[in-house]
C-alpha cells in the first residue's frame, strides 16, 4: 500500500471539497498523511504535524497550483519523494492533472501506471566575505533583490 502525503492549498480548494474527494477516493487504497490542522474534517487519515508530513510518505499529492508545488519541491527532492500535482490554479505547468481527471489519474497512479519526470534543481548561496551565509535549492526560479539602502549588489552566476 502506497504511503501518500496530501497537501492542499486551501485558498484554491475552498471548503477543501476536492481534498475530501481525493481522500475518500484513496481510502482503503493507500495510507494517507495530512496536516493535523485539518483534523476538524474528521477524515479517515493519519493526521500529523505539518513539519512532519513527509516523514512517512513515499509520494506527495498536491492540490493547488504551481506555487503549492514550488513550496515543497526542495524538501521533496532531498527526500526523493515524487510529487503529483492536481491543478486547481489557472495554468498549471507543473500541476499536470486537471481536477476533472483526478480519479482516473489517481487510479493509474495506484496501479503504478506512471513515470516520474525528473526536474533540474538550482542551488543558490548567499555569501558575505566569501563565506556561505545561507544556501538553498529551488525548482523554478530564484529571485535576487537588493537590501533597502544598498545602492549596488554584486552577483556571481555559475552553471555546471
What are these regions (language model features)?
Residues 80-97:
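Short, acidic/small-residue loops that bind anionic groups at enzyme active sites
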Residues 1-63, 68-78:
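N-terminal glycine-/serine-/threonine-rich phosphate-binding loop
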Amino acid at each position: 500500500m502506497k504511503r501518500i502525503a496530501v497537501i492542499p492549498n486551501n485558498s484554491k480548494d475552498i471548503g477543501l471539497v476536492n481534498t475530501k474527494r481525493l481522500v475518500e477516493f484513496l481510502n482503503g487504497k493507500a495510507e494517507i498523511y495530512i496536516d493535523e490542522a485539518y483534523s476538524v474534517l474528521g477524515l479517515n487519515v493519519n493526521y500529523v504535524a505539518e513539519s512532519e508530513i513527509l516523514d512517512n510518505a513515499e509520494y506527495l499529492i498536491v492540490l493547488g497550483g504551481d506555487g503549492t508545488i514550488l513550496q515543497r519541491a526542495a524538501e521533496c527532492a532531498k527526500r526523493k519523494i515524487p510529487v503529483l500535482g492536481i491543478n486547481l490554479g489557472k495554468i498549471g505547468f507543473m500541476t499536470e492533472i486537471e481536477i476533472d481527471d483526478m480519479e482516473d489519474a489517481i487510479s493509474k497512479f495506484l496501479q503504478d501506471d506512471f513515470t516520474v519526470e525528473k526536474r533540474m534543481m538550482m542551488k543558490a548561496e548567499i555569501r558575505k566575505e566569501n563565506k556561505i551565509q545561507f544556501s538553498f535549492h529551488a525548482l523554478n526560479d530564484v529571485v535576487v533583490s537588493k537590501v533597502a539602502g544598498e545602492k549596488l549588489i554584486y552577483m556571481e552566476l555559475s552553471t555546471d
